[in-house]
């Protein structure tokens, strides 16, 4: 099994550093090079690759400096997005070998048109597509694209760990409880999250099993979720339910 370290950046970003027992590492979505370089120096890591999920600056801002410091580093990212110094463009269904583990690339458009996620070693690095108890805003893609992307990720094994790129869990849970105020699991989990955050601790990684219990955007087939948006939809297809939820969340 590979190990993962979180490197906090900006106000609420997480840069993920994946490493093995030989001190080789990969970083995911390095929006800022400084904390990454500090972590690499502290642990005497060797940077092999950078994985990028999408082109937003808080996910790629540190790439040029990391490439300057490590000229031979592989930069892996979505083939149809403007990523600086990209060496390995990838798309849905491609594989990336990291530390003798095969990571599969999932095309998960919605937040951006070319957004990808990486899954391997029972870990999902999903950028701004899936959050704990939430999902990314639709800056470029359509609601139907995002719905399908979330369904694709939800089809992975329940034990898959979810490494999203932002600490949004507490605010997302507030919305989830507006959707499902009688969801006992949600109520209990919110207390745990508030305790963790009060002590400065991360709520990430989550798991897909947990997300299926707390994330309204993965619960569009649930009667209580459908009921919560019944007045906002023309019909009750899951895509329409998702679209109504996403609009509601944008205004929440």
Swiss-Prot record:
Q: Could you say which EC number(s) this protein's record lists?
A: 3.1.2.6
- Tell me the leader sequence span: none
Q: Which InterPro entries match?
A: Clx_II_MBL, Glyoxalase_II_hydrolase, HAGH_C, Hydroxyacylglutathione_Hdrlase, Metallo-B-lactamas, RibonucZ/Hydroxyglut_hydro
GO molecular function list: hydroxyacylglutathione hydrolase activity; metal ion binding
Obligatory cofactor(s): Zn(2+)
Q: In which pathway does it act?
A: Secondary metabolite metabolism; methylglyoxal degradation; (R)-lactate from methylglyoxal: step 2/2
Question: What superkingdom does the record give?
Answer: Bacteria
Give residues annotated as binding Zn(2+) 2. Answer: 58-59, 128, 166
Cofactor binding notes:
Binds 2 Zn(2+) ions per subunit.
Pfam families, from UniProt?
Answer: HAGH_C, Lactamase_B
Q: Keywords of this protein's UniProt record, alphabetized?
A: Hydrolase, Metal-binding, Zinc
Instruction: From the UniProt record, list the reaction(s) this protein catalyses.
Output: an S-(2-hydroxyacyl)glutathione + H2O = a 2-hydroxy carboxylate + glutathione + H(+)
Q: Which CDD domains match?
A: hydroxyacylglutathione_hydrolase_MBL-fold
What does this chain do?
Thiolesterase that catalyzes the hydrolysis of S-D-lactoyl-glutathione to form glutathione and D-lactic acid.
Task: State the family named in the UniProt similarity comment for this chain.
Answer: Belongs to the metallo-beta-lactamase superfamily. Glyoxalase II family.
Q: Tell me, how does this one assemble? A: Monomer.
**Which PANTHER family does this chain map to?**
HYDROXYACYLGLUTATHIONE HYDROLASE (PTHR43705), HYDROXYACYLGLUTATHIONE HYDROLASE GLOB (PTHR43705:SF1)
Protein name as it appears in the record: Hydroxyacylglutathione hydrolase
């Amino acid at each position: 099994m590979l190990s993962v370290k979180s490197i906090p950046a900006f106000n609420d970003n997480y840069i993920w550093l994946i490493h093995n027992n030989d001190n080789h590492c990969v970083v995911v979505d390095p929006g800022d090079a400084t904390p990454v370089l500090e972590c690499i120096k502290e642990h005497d890591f060797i940077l092999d690759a950078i994985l990028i999920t999408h082109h937003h600056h808080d996910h790629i801002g540190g790439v040029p400096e990391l490439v300057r410091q490590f000229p031979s580093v592989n930069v892996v990212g979505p083939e149809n997005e403007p990523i600086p110094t990209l060496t390995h463009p990838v798309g849905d269904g491609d594989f990336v070998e990291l530390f003798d583990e095969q990571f599969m690339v999932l095309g998960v458009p919605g937040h951006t048109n070319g957004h990808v996620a990486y899954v391997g070693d029972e870990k999902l690095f999903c950028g701004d597509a899936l959050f704990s108890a939430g999902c990314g805003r639709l800056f470029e893609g359509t609601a139907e694209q995002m719905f399908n992307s979330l369904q694709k990720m939800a089809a992975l094994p329940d034990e898959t760990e979810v490494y999203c790129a932002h600490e949004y869990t507490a605010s997302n849970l507030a919305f989830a409880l507006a959707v499902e105020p009688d969801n006992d699991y949600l109520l209990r989990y919110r207390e745990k999250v508030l305790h963790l955050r009060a002590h400065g601790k991360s709520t990430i990684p989550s798991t897909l099993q947990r997300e299926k219990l707390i994330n309204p955007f993965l619960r569009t087939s649930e009667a209580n979720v459908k009921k919560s948006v019944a007045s906002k939809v023309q019909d009750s297809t899951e895509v329409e339910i998702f679209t109504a939820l996403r609009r509601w969340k944008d205004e929440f």
